[in-house]
A protein has these predicted regions:
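Receiver (REC) domain active-site loop signature in two-component systems and cognate sites
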Residues: 56
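Active-site beta3 strand of CheY-like receiver
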Residues: 45-51
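Single conserved hydrophobic/aromatic residue that forms the stacking wall/gate
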Residues: 152-160
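Short, flexible helix-to-coil linker/hinge segments that flank and couple to helix-turn-helix
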Residues: 87-93, 103-148
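Active-site residues of response regulator receiver
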Residues: 7, 53, 81
Length: 160
């Protein structure tokens, strides 16, 4: 599967590229450093999965995700960030990102990319633990996003 990595930390991008290219089924087409790069690279390559940081200079990953998904409704975007911030999680769900994992979970990145590529929505463990609380704050979600989130978390009901 073909992916693009976008992160403003060159060390993170380079490390992810090395790790992910060690898998025979993953090819890193390109790397970028901000949301503008993400949009341009996505339009150029149309990857199977876009792996992107949220907090970046110039244009953040959430804004870029929204713009990419507007132009490419089938885009599969997996957000990789240091922040398990409630507002970021809510915005990611509303934007239509297919996953949200923490950078501390490097060992799960390849499996998360594969899951997103296969049409699943992925949340890292720490994020997954927050979702029930976020869902209880119904007013923070519009109704369609609320339903989608319930659908995707229903498989993990034993963990709730």
């Amino acid at each position: 599967m073909n992916i693009i990595i976008v992160d403003d930390d060159a060390f993170v991008s380079a490390s992810l590229k090395i790790i992910l290219e060690s898998y025979s089924d993953i090819t890193v087409l390109a790397t970028g450093a901000n949301g503008h790069d993400a949009i341009s690279l996505y339009d150029t390559y149309i990857p199977d999965v876009l792996l992107m940081d949220i907090r970046m200079e110039g244009m953040d990953g959430l804004t870029a995700s929204k713009e990419i998904i507007t132009g490419h409704p089938d885009a599969k975007i997996l957000l990789l960030t240091t922040f398990a911030d409630d507002d970021y999680i809510i915005k990611a769900i509303r934007t239509g990102a297919k996953g949200y994992i923490l950078k501390q979970d490097f060992e799960t990145v390849a499996s998360a990319i594969t899951a997103v590529h296969n049409g699943q929505t992925v949340f890292g463990n720490e994020i997954m633990n927050k979702i029930p609380t976020l869902l209880q704050a119904e007013d923070r979600f519009d109704y369609p996003s609320y339903n989608l989130c319930l659908l995707y978390t229903s498989d993990a009901a034993d963990d709730l």
